[in-house]
C-alpha cells in the first residue's frame, strides 16, 4: 500500500477541496514550466513531473514546458573529451559545443520527457526554436566582474511566434521546448532555458512561470537557511540581484523579466520534491518563493 492509499479518506477529501479554488483560477490559462535540475535526472522525479503535466492538461490548464539539459550536455562533453567552460552562470558555446547541445537537448532530453508525458495520453510535442520559426535569437554577452564577456553561440530570445505555440495549445498539446533558435542570419544559438522560459511566458501572456531548481527557493543571504523568503516583489529582487550566487542569477533574471513583462507571478520551486508543480499550484501554502510585481 502506498503512502497516499494509507491516508484517511477525509484527508484526501480535504486535499481535493483545497485544490478547487486554484483549479478554477487556472482553468484555461497557460502555465509555463522551466524543467531542469534533479527533476531531469532522477527517474522518480521525472515520472512525477510528466504525470503533473498530464494532470494539468486534463484539468483544462495549458502547460508549456521549456527544458534545459545542463547536466546531460556536460556529461556528453566529457564522454567526447570536450572541455566546457562557464562564465557569468552561462555555458560558453563554441560551434563544437553547440553540436553537442543540439544532439542532447532535442534528441535526448526532449525525447525522454515527451515519451514520459505521452505514457499518459497523446499530449506532448517536442519542438525547438527552429521549428515553425517558433522563436529567434539574438547573440548575447554577459558581464563578469564588470566586463562584457563573449560566451560564444549563446543567445537571448528576440521574438516568439506565439501563433505557432498557441496552435499547439489549442489542439490540446503540451509543447516541450528545447531552447535552440536561429538568429536573423540563420545561425543557431543555444539559449539559456531560464531566459527562454521567461520570454515564452511573457509572449504567451502566461498566468504563471514556474522555475524548477535544486534548492528550496530564494535565499536572500545564502547560505543562511533562515533567509529563505516565501514572497518577494520585483523591486526588492532587482536590488538583491548583484549579491546572488552566479548560478541563481539567470533564474532570478528570468523571474524579473516575466513578471515585469506582465506575467502575474513567477515561482522558484524545489524540483527535488515529488509533484512539486502540483504542490505549488494547488495548495494554499505552496512551496519555494513567489515573485510578484512591485
From Swiss-Prot:
GO terms for biological process: arginine biosynthetic process via ornithine; L-arginine biosynthetic process. Substrate binds at residues 69-70, 91, 190. It is found in: Cytoplasm. One of its GO terms (cellular component) is cytoplasm. Pfam families: AA_kinase. Catalyzes the ATP-dependent phosphorylation of N-acetyl-L-glutamate. This is Acetylglutamate kinase. The lineage of its organism: Bacteria, Bacillati, Actinomycetota, Actinomycetes, Mycobacteriales.
Amino acid at each position: 500500500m502506498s503512502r497516499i492509499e494509507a491516508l484517511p479518506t477525509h484527508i484526501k477529501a480535504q486535499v481535493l477541496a483545497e485544490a478547487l479554488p486554484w483549479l478554477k483560477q487556472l482553468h484555461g490559462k497557460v502555465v509555463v514550466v522551466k524543467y531542469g535540475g534533479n527533476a531531469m535526472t532522477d527517474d522518480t522525479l521525472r515520472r512525477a513531473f510528466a504525470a503533473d503535466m498530464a494532470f494539468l492538461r486534463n484539468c483544462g490548464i495549458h502547460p508549456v514546458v521549456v527544458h534545459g539539459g545542463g547536466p546531460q550536455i556536460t556529461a556528453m562533453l566529457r564522454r567526447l573529451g570536450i572541455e566546457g567552460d562557464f562564465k557569468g552562470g552561462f555555458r560558453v558555446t563554441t560551434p563544437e559545443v553547440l553540436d553537442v547541445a543540439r544532439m542532447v537537448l532535442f534528441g535526448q532530453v526532449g525525447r525522454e520527457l515527451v515519451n514520459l508525458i505521452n505514457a499518459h495520453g497523446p499530449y506532448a510535442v517536442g519542438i525547438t526554436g527552429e521549428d515553425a520559426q517558433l522563436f529567434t535569437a539574438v547573440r548575447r554577452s554577459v558581464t563578469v566582474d564588470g566586463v562584457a564577456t563573449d560566451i560564444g553561440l549563446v543567445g537571448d530570445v528576440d521574438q516568439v511566434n506565439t501563433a505557432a505555440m498557441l496552435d499547439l495549445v489549442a489542439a490540446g498539446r503540451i509543447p516541450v521546448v528545447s531552447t535552440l533558435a536561429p538568429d536573423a542570419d540563420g545561425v543557431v544559438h543555444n539559449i539559456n532555458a531560464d531566459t527562454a522560459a521567461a520570454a515564452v511566458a511573457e509572449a504567451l501572456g502566461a498566468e504563471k512561470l514556474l522555475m524548477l531548481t535544486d534548492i528550496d527557493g530564494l535565499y536572500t543571504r545564502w547560505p543562511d537557511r533562515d533567509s529563505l523568503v516565501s514572497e518577494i516583489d520585483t523591486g526588492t529582487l532587482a536590488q538583491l540581484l548583484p549579491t546572488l550566487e552566479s548560478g541563481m542569477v539567470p533564474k532570478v533574471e528570468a523571474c524579473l523579466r516575466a513578471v515585469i513583462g506582465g506575467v502575474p507571478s513567477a515561482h522558484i520551486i524545489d524540483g527535488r520534491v515529488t509533484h512539486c508543480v502540483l504542490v505549488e499550484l494547488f495548495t494554499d501554502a505552496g512551496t519555494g518563493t513567489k515573485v510578484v510585481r512591485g
